[in-house]
Amino acid sequence: MKKPLLLTLLCMILAGCDNPKSLESFTPEMASFSNEFDFDPLRGPVKDFSQTLMSENGEVAKQVTGTLSQEGCFDTLELHDLENNTGLALVLDANYYRDAQTLEKKVQLQGKCQLAALPSAGVTWETDDNGFVVSATGKEMKVEYRYDSEGYPVGKTTINSQNRLSVTAKPSANPRKKLDYTAVSRVDDRQVGNVTQSCEYDAYANPVDCRLVIVDESVKPAVSHHYTIKNRIDYY
């Protein structure tokens, strides 16, 4: 058998041998919203998605769903945190996100569709020259956000009158596996927790299935919590 034909057959048999799509950076809106609303950022022409966090007992702990325009703006965003019995549902309307049920104006926007202010809580967001949210300032606290060269969120620091909480994430060196990461949480100079995540990816280098381990080091002995994350993503 000729070598080129053999390689062709091997490519047909082996998973991942088809041509991968070129990597796209994370948009300012996707990266910033993922920071504020606590979900894994996605890249590429995402049309709609859902992320479901499940405990090791198979119970849904949290779910995030969203729809995006072809320009990358969030048309809708819905979050349900079952562990803490909280949630919200937002729908885009010109320069605001409204509550999907009451239609009350909730979030004020800037630029194309970036976060600007949450008037009811007295929170304002500031962006850098590239449009990424780099800080959120409220009445009694300030949050500073950090990103890498591809726009991936790599940490945040929350400062209030009592302490300083920092989270620092280190993603995989493999550019196609950004959501494989380790993170460390500190209160002032004391480490209080760590997180490890590993995922399987689609052709856009977005996570499909992930395993998440959260270790609470603020108690002795430390307590580990194991989760799985199921992602459904549709593209344009």
Swiss-Prot record:
Keywords, in A-Z order: Cell membrane, Lipoprotein, Membrane, Palmitate, Signal
UniProt subcellular location: Cell membrane
Residues in the signal sequence: 1-16
Positions of N-palmitoyl cysteine lipidation: C17
One Pfam family named in its UniProt record: UPF0257
Taxonomy, superkingdom: Bacteria
Cystines in this chain: none
Lipid modification (S-diacylglycerol cysteine), residues: C17
Assigned protein family: Belongs to the UPF0257 family.
Protein's name according to its UniProt entry: UPF0257 lipoprotein YnfC
Organism: Salmonella heidelberg (strain SL476)
Lineage, broadest ranks: Bacteria, Pseudomonadati, Pseudomonadota, Gammaproteobacteria, Enterobacterales
